[in-house]
């Protein structure tokens, strides 16, 4: 999402710029997913009992704000000024765009989990993002992947860092950590699909502006987002002024979620879709996402643990099949500590396949 004006709390503010300095907003998000557990058999509580004021203070450190929230019996969903936050019993997912300082909030999240829920150990960590268009505008902690890895390594021993994709195209960075624990939770099928889209169709971009839609709900229906999200999902969203869109959804009585964020300025257009739902086929849902946004470039990832049949099916289809209208330029398979990952990059068939928007980010092309 993006915005160039501010209210008391709703959007990121931007400093006044010299007349010859062009406006820019980094739509690509930083994504942190943390799974917690206890080091003892003492009674634990849900992360969802962390007080709202503590969550607000944590997000202040990351430089974003809560706009609104919704809840069911399994998950708390927050639409932020810069993307999204989801909290379930033992998992936190924080996704922030722009020039936020996401990793600066990490020690606070860990402290809150121990203090309020008795979850004093991080069992699994996933930090990921694509390459930035303007890494020079990021805070020092996020200017390059080497700096992010060094910071994460200060908390987690034996973490792993990866760079997936061609260095001549958009690429994707991942840091993972997993701790073998004495008292593991009951294992459930788990998978995550993420679609990162850039250079979107101009007709699509206009749909995510105040000139086209009145508010978030109007945008949800008129832009075709309603065709992507499974029927019956509970949705809350925000259409920013003058442009930009964020949406969270969760499936009733589960901790399954979906989130969409759109930066609709033509010079640096970007949209993301992420979900762990298992109600509909992930490959079919992917095709609906692409029909909605019509991007010229796509970066896709699918995580799946060994008991997620739907996740493994999506991985197989991503590995075996082309997406209609697109040419796959790269596909990679990675076996992680507790799951597998398939990464793929696509360009429209009319495109040359070279990412003219790809930055010169010196992100330490490291992989373990």
UniProtKB/Swiss-Prot annotation:
It comes from Caenorhabditis elegans. One of its GO terms (cellular component) is cytosol. The record marks 82-83 as: Cleavage (non-hydrolytic). Pathway: Amine and polyamine biosynthesis; S-adenosylmethioninamine biosynthesis; S-adenosylmethioninamine from S-adenosyl-L-methionine: step 1/1. The modification Pyruvic acid (Ser) is found at residue 83. PANTHER family: S-ADENOSYLMETHIONINE DECARBOXYLASE (PTHR11570), S-ADENOSYLMETHIONINE DECARBOXYLASE PROENZYME (PTHR11570:SF0). The active site is at 26, 29, 83 (schiff-base intermediate with substrate), 97 (proton donor), 246 (proton acceptor), 261 (proton acceptor). It is an enzyme of class 4 (lyase). NCBIfam families: SAM_DCase. Disruption phenotype: Reduced body size as compared to wild-type with the production of fewer progeny. Reduced spermidine levels, but increased putrescine accumulation. Double knockout with the polyamine transporter catp-5 results in a reduced brood size, delayed postembryonic development, and a more marked reduction in spermidine levels and a more marked increase in putrescine accumulation as compared to the single mutants. This is S-adenosylmethionine decarboxylase proenzyme. Keywords: Autocatalytic cleavage, Decarboxylase, Lyase, Polyamine biosynthesis, Pyruvate, S-adenosyl-L-methionine, Schiff base, Spermidine biosynthesis, Zymogen. SUPFAM superfamilies: S-adenosylmethionine decarboxylase. Is synthesized initially as an inactive proenzyme. Formation of the active enzyme involves a self-maturation process in which the active site pyruvoyl group is generated from an internal serine residue via an autocatalytic post-translational modification. Two non-identical subunits are generated from the proenzyme in this reaction, and the pyruvate is formed at the N-terminus of the alpha chain, which is derived from the carboxyl end of the proenzyme. InterPro entries: AdoMetDC-like (IPR048283), S-AdoMet_decarboxylase_euk (IPR001985), S-AdoMet_deCO2ase_core (IPR016067), S-AdoMet_deCO2ase_CS (IPR018166). Binds 1 pyruvoyl group covalently per subunit. It catalyses: S-adenosyl-L-methionine + H(+) = S-adenosyl 3-(methylsulfanyl)propylamine + CO2. Essential for biosynthesis of the polyamines spermidine and spermine. Polyamines are essential for cell proliferation and are implicated in cellular processes, ranging from DNA replication to apoptosis. Pfam families: SAM_decarbox. One of its GO terms (biological process) is spermidine biosynthetic process. One of its GO terms (molecular function) is adenosylmethionine decarboxylase activity. Its EC number is 4.1.1.50. Its cofactor is pyruvate. Heterotetramer of two alpha and two beta chains.
């Amino acid at each position: 999402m993006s915005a160039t004006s501010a209210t008391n709390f709703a959007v990121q503010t931007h400093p006044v710029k010299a007349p010859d300095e062009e406006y820019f907003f980094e739509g690509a998000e930083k994504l942190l997913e943390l799974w917690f557990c206890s080091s003892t058999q003492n009674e634990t509580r849900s992360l969802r009992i962390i007080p709202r004021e503590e969550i607000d203070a944590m997000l202040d450190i990351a430089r974003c704000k809560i706009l609104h929230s919704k809840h069911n019996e399994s998950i708390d969903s927050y639409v932020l000024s810069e993307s999204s936050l989801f909290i379930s019993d033992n998992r936190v997912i924080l996704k922030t765009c722009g020039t936020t300082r996401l990793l600066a909030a990490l020690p606070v999240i860990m402290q809150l989990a121990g203090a309020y829920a008795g979850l004093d150990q991080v069992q699994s960590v996933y930090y990921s993002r694509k390459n930035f268009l303007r890494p020079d505008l990021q805070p020092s902690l996020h200017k390059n992947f080497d700096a992010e890895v060094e910071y994460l390594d200060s908390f987690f021993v034996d973490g792993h860092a990866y760079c997936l994709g061609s260095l001549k195209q958009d690429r994707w960075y991942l840091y993972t950590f997993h701790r073998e624990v004495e008292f593991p939770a009951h294992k459930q099928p788990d998978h995550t699909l993420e679609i990162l889209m850039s250079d979107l169709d101009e007709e699509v971009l206009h749909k995510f502006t105040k000139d086209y839609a009145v508010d978030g709900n109007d945008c949800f229906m008129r832009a075709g987002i309603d065709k992507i999200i499974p029927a019956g999902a509970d949705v809350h969203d925000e259409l920013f002024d003058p442009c930009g869109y964020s949406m969270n959804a969760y499936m009733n009585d589960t901790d399954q979620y979906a989130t969409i964020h759109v930066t609709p300025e033509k010079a640096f257009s970007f949209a993301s879709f992420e979900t762990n739902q298992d109600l509909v086929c992930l490959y079919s849902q992917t095709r609906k996402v692409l029909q909605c946004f019509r991007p010229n470039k796509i970066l896709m990832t699918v995580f799946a643990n060994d008991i997620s049949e739907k996740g493994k099916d999506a991985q197989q289809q991503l590995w075996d099949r082309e997406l209609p209208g697109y040419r796959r330029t790269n596909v990679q398979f990675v076996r992680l500590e507790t799951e597998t990952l398939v990464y793929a990059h696509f360009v429209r068939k009319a495109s040359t396949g070279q990412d003219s928007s790809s930055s010169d980010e010196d992100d330490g092309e490291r992989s373990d």
